[in-house]
Design a protein with these regions (language model features):
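Charged, alpha-helix-forming regions
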Residues: 1-331
């Protein structure tokens, strides 16, 4: 994402109408320092943040895990596992030994969360409380984290990085009344996917759950993406060499898996691709896809007076008919 500099801050306008700032607007970093920090943001930063928000949304209902201030513990190893990262291993005595994630892997997750904690939101939104519109102003951190680690037992060694206590900023409270129960159920289903064998499905699900959450107060919920946009926003790399023989089948299989698991309500390609043509991969990347939230989430929005069903939403509140068969495995 390009972050233009505005006055003393880098900022951009998000698709949900919030102004997103890098750094505290009241105590801004020097622009040169802020730019240096921004350049360290990578694809994993977004994936890490989505995973942490999903874990928080699940654990906040567990009184043994959540603190009075709404914080929940998350270890770096949990996030690395959901990213699909493999643990370090080596061969000894003819056997392969696994000794966990490398310290530098944990440092990457720590850096991701530290960068995300420097993001601030500011803006006015119309929210719905008991079916009535109400103007609200939001300003503050996107997330708040406290880092913890274990001191080393040996002099000169670095502490062992463990994890964070994590809580979203106050912006989350505004959305809680809209979709709290239903999004928690979606997150529960997402975290039942396989960490390694269903990574494409996980990346798509993390993005789409984030989309349902951040656009909860939109009046319409027709989500249309080009396939290239869907992959980019889901942080899925496009392998051009294996586009038609591996990536495209895996993504379409993953979408069907998400529908079968109730993580999305329905999906369709608005102009089907002629896959009998040679080199159809670019057409597939440019194709437009409509993806709807689960029926339970849409109906809860309409019951609360938040959403108004468009013609396409109304027609697709029930999942489309699919051939019977086993639930697909992977992505």
């Amino acid at each position: 994402k390009d972050w233009p500099a505005e006055e003393r801050l880098y900022r951009f306008d998000a698709s949900n109408d919030f102004a997103v700032y890098f750094g505290d607007p009241d105590h801004p970093l020097p622009l040169a320092e802020a730019k240096t920090q921004l350049m360290t943001i990578r694809d994993s930063t977004l994936v890490t943040l989505r995973i942490a928000l999903g874990i928080w949304n699940l654990r906040k209902h567990n009184p043994s895990l959540i603190s009075p201030t709404g914080r929940i513990p998350i270890t770096y190893d949990e996030i690395l596992a959901w990213q699909g990262r493999r643990k370090h291993s080596y061969v000894s005595g003819g056997k392969r030994i696994t000794d966990g994630y490398r310290p530098e892997d944990r440092e990457e997750v720590r850096d991701d969360l530290k960068l995300a904690s420097m993001i601030y939101l500011k803006g006015d939104r119309t929210i719905y409380i008991n079916g009535r519109q109400q103007k609200s102003h939001f300003e503050g951190r996107y997330i708040d984290v406290t880092f913890w680690d274990y001191p080393s037992l040996f002099s000169g060694e670095k502490p062992r990085l463990q994890g964070v206590t994590f809580v979203p900023g106050g912006w989350m409270d505004a959305y809680a009344s809209a979709n709290n129960i239903y999004l928690a159920e979606i997150d529960r289903r997402v975290f039942q996917l396989h960490k390694h064998h269903e990574q494409h499905a996980l990346r798509l699900a993390f993005f789409l759950a984030d989309e349902w959450r951040s656009h909860a107060y939109d009046t319409h919920h027709d989500y249309i993406f080009t396939m290239a946009e869907l992959l980019a926003r889901s942080v899925i790399r496009v392998d051009k060499r294996n586009l038609t023989n591996r990536l495209a089948p895996s993504i379409e299989k993953s979408l069907e898996l998400l529908r079968a698991r109730g993580i999305i309500g329905s999906y369709e390609c608005l102009a089907p691709i002629d896959k009998s043509k040679p080199q159809w991969g670019n057409d597939w990347l440019a194709s437009r896809w409509r993806i709807l939230p689960p029926e339970s989430l849409l109906q809860s929005y309409m019951a609360k007076g938040i959403a108004q069903p468009s013609a396409s939403t109304q027609a697709r509140l029930s999942p489309p008919k699919h051939r019977r068969g086993r639930t697909p495995k992977g992505g």
